[in-house]
Amino acid sequence: MNRISVFYEHMAEAMKQENITLDEVCAAVKRFGFDGVELDANRIKNEGDVILPALQKAGLCVNGIYNFFDFIHFFVF
């Protein structure tokens, strides 16, 4: 099954620009034909208790989780 996803960061920006709630943006995303959301791992850690139920309520799923790593400071050369 193919899923079309949107980055949650775009949804967060839409909430700011349009002054709408998370539930409203989730409903709009679903209405626009998206099935899933790509989420930053840190956002899930910090806001998952709010975001995940709203996604589920709208019939959306988490299609991918990404994170950013600072490898230049992780490895000692």
Tell what function each PLM region has:
Residues 1-77:
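N-terminal pre-domain/capping segments
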